[in-house]
Structures are given as C-alpha cells and as structure tokens.
Amino acid sequence: MILFKSPRFTRLYCTFFLLLVLVLTLVGSRIDPARKRTGGALRVVADRVAQLSSRPWSRVGAGDTAEEAHRRAWELARATQYAGTGARVQRFLEKALRGEPFTVAAIGGSVSKGRGLTPPKSAQPEPEGEIHGATTLYSRENLHFLVFDWLNATFPHPNNRFVNGAQGGVGAGYFAWCFKEHIPTDVDLVLVELGINDLNHLRVIAKYELLVRSVLELDSAPAIINIETFTTLFHELISSSALHNDVLAYYDIPSLSIRDVLLPRLMADPDVQMPRWFRTGGDVSLGDDKVREWGGVPVDLMHISAKGHGLAAGLIINYLSTQLALVAPSTPKGLFGRFSAARLRKTLEHVYDIPDTWLTQSFDPTELPERRAPVCRSMNSAKLHNRVSGTDDVPENDQVRGLVLHPSSHGWEPWAWMEKHYLVARKPGALAVFDFVISAPLPATHDDDDDEVIEDPLDVYSAFEGTATRAASVRREMPTRLRLKDQVAARQEQPTRRSSTFRKAHNEGSSDGGTVAIGFQRSANYGLGSVHCWVDEDRTKGRRLDGWWEIKERNMGIVTEVATGLQPGRHRLQCELLADTLDPLKRHEFRLFAIVHN
C-alpha cells in the first residue's frame, strides 16, 4: 500500500494513464474527425501535466511524511485570512499551464523593497534604462522574487517577467492613484503587501478598495494575492490588515498572513525567535524608534528578515500549489474532474467577479457608479509624461519624468534621500504651482451576462419534513425580476435619490466631480513644516497640510485631498509653505513627492 501512495508511483501512474488517453483519443479521431479538436486540447493539457509531474518543485510537500503534510496544512490554514474561490488565480495558472508567458508584479512598501536583504549581483534596470528604487527590489531573498522564481521554474518560458513596483514608506493611499507608474498594465498576477504601511484607520478601507478595484479592472484582468506581514512595535497587534480583509473578501481576493504562524514561536522564546524573524545587523541600532532589544540584539520590528521573507514566500507558494492541484490534478480522477470543474467555474465566476457597486458606497443596483481614471505624477516614477498632467492622450515630443513646476513657482527644488525623490521647500512663502486637467468620467459599464436571474444559493437550510414548528411559514410567489438594464432605464425617468452620507467621506470613489490630492512626507523626526494648498483662484477654500506628526515610529508618505467636485477641464493647483509649523523646533521643510487627480 505504501507503494501506491508514494509520489513517484503517482507520477508514473498518471503519466501512463495520460498516454493511454492520448492513444485512445487519436484512434477515435481517425474514426470520427469531429473529435480531433478535443484530442488536440487533451494532448496540450496531458503534455503540460506530464511535465509538471516530472518536476519535484511543482507540488509543494510532494515528499512530505504524514506528520509534515499535517503540519504544512495547519500552517497554511493558520495563515489564510481569506481563501475565496481562487477563480482568478486558477485562471492565471491555466494560462501558465498552456505554456503562455506571464507577468508577475509586486505592490508594497519597504518590506517588499527588501529592506535589509542581500542585493543581487546585478541590479535589474527599468525599461527606460534607469534604476528607480532600492537595489534589493530583485534580491534573491525577496519574498516576491521567490514566488516568481517558483512560478518560473514550474512554468518556464523565456518571456516570463517579474516587476517589483514596491515603494518604501507609502501605502494604499499612494498606490490607489499611482500603481500604473510602477507596474505594467499587462500584468497577470499582482502580489500586494501593505499590512504595515497603511494606518489602522477606517479611511484606509476606501483607499484600499480603490487600489484593488483599479487593479482588477485592468484590461489584462489580473489575479491578486494579498500577503500581510506584521509588527510588534505598536500598542496593539491588530493592524490595517483587519481593514483590508473585508475589501479582499468583497472582491474574492485570497489573503495570507505570517502573523498567526509566527506568534506562537515568538511568544514561546522571544529572545531567540525575534532576531530570527525580524531584521538585525547592518544599520539596525538602538535609538531608532523602530528598534527594540531582544536577546541582547537590536531588532528592527518593522521589517522581517530574510527568513521572514522565505516564510511569506513559502505560504504563497503553498497556496499556489493547492490551486495548481485544482487546475492540473496529479491523479486520473482529478484530471477528468478538472474539466467539469473548470466549465462550472466559468459559468459561475461572473457572479463573483468585480461587483457593479463599491463596498464603500451606498447600495443602489439601478445606479452604476461613475468611473474616473486615476492620474499620477510621481517624483519616484521613471515613466515619461506630458508637462501638463492629464494630457497624455496626445503625447508630446518633450515628455518628462516626475513633477513639473509652472514657471510662476519659486522656492522649490528637487532633492533626494537615497532612492526617494522629492520637491522640497524650506523658506516660508515658497510657492509650488502645477497645471492639471480633469477628464470627463468614463461611461459606466455593465455586463449583460449579469442580467441573468441568479439561482438561490444551495446552502439555504430548511427543517426536515415533519419537524414540529410553532407556525407554518407562508411561501409567497416572488414577482418577475426586471432585467437590470430595464431597471436602470426606469430609474432614469424618476427623480434621482442618492444617499450622500458615506460618499462625502469617501472622495476616492466620489461621483460628484473630479478630485486632486498631493503626496507628501509626514514625520516626527525630520523637522517638517506645513503648506496651504488651493485650486484655481479660490484660496479661501484651500486646505492646510502638516508634514509634522506625533508618530515617532513612522516616517511615511501620505496622499491627502486638496479639493473635490472639480469640473472637467484645466485647473491650477498652488501650495504655499507656511511660516506657522507644528514642529517643536519651528523648522519648516516640506517634502512633496506626488500630484494625483482623476
């Protein structure tokens, strides 16, 4: 019996059975030419499954003992914050299984950049020929590189591509507007890691939703896998991952976290385990607000170590392996079940795809939300754009990188700290002026396939027949449902009713006009000052933005709105450095790194 359970026997048996299927299919196609198309499809899948069966790395845990298999399953279960259907990930794996090249990209902060990891022997240049970002973006210890390395080994193709778009010290508020500045738009799989970058505040929900929804709406229809790291630095262990997870569930995005796998070990022996899983050595020293001493060793509690990266990557790879087992089973029974399962998924997945309504907006199935394309100009992007933001529809000959100041600006200059780039002002009265164009909203879209009447869920439980009840329920006949587009047409003939309670607080998805915001640094350590920003000539409706804050452990880039409700057309944003400052030492420096609008 042990022989029949061994991975080697399973691979041999599977390969033999697939060859038998191919022979029978070829014979059948000679008898019935109509079967040739089916035979071709079977041959492609059979070849790929046979190749996978010969690669020991394609099946995580293929050689595990029973105890190791149980432990591996336990760790994945503890790490899984939301599993979902896996439909998009399976769709990505099916593409790879067909032998097509794929692109994997990463969105994240300094953990994803590889803070403290060993740089690769040669840094990977950007397509434009300039390296923008840390040299550890493509470290062989980086969790995202490790995931791509496994995928590339499992599905080798010379045109497989990995792009690490991580940016240190920013969160979903930045990437929601600017992710296209850092990753390609033809991406197939996006790995997101922002658990310690986003503040633990309800406002994060809307920003995070804008990010994941915008990524899912790319023409390439990518899959997303969310991975959360964690920190023990603050007063509570709970973090923004708690706010991310409801958004991830709403959009059926799998989410994994290393926290609940590591915590039992950290609690059992912190002096030994903390230096193993978090960053040490190098520039880690006491006196840094992110550093605490464990076991006599200074430990950076915001950034996981190379071993921590390996754990995060291993959990993602384990998850991918479980999904691969569904699309490329290693047993004959599973292989044939796969075809019916794939067809069933394709009939169901439109039900669970991108919802017509936002999670952070009021429910109204007859009023589709406006779609506004985010526009970003970032000092940390290598992409070229027209000088006036929002006019890239007609490319100019002298396109530039970063932010372009209007000639009327004064007192601002480019400045960089390592790989982070800013426009900086230090003298009160300095004025930054930017021209930008608000575009008209994109037409609301709706898939006619969604007009089908969806059957009730199967898991609607009823009492067994004969069970005594206090009162019999009365079954009412439900009225015939209008097709959604007919409801929309009927609604347009009625006065518009709109609940604005949440929408006023959720400007990222607002349908009440365009928005403009700026990205700037906040810190308690850098002596940062304040600016007053306004749009066009209405200075009185402007907004004060403070660079200094009280959070000593975080030096972060924040994106904050200046104005909303802007009409389509050309506008002018102005920001003036104020003499008044929150910095205890009365310093004034202000660091601006992005202008975003829609």
Regions found by a protein language model. Give the residues of each.
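N-terminal secretory targeting modules
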Residues: 1-107, 111-137, 156-158, 298-598
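Alpha-helical scaffolding within the catalytic cores
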Residues: 87-92, 148, 172-183, 206-214, ...
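Active-site segments of SGNH/GDSL-like serine hydrolases
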Residues: 193-197, 210-245
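Extracellular serine-dependent O-acyl
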Residues: 30-31, 53, 223-228, 239-295, ...
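Soluble non-cytosolic domains of exported or imported proteins
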Residues: 102, 137-142, 169, 173, ...
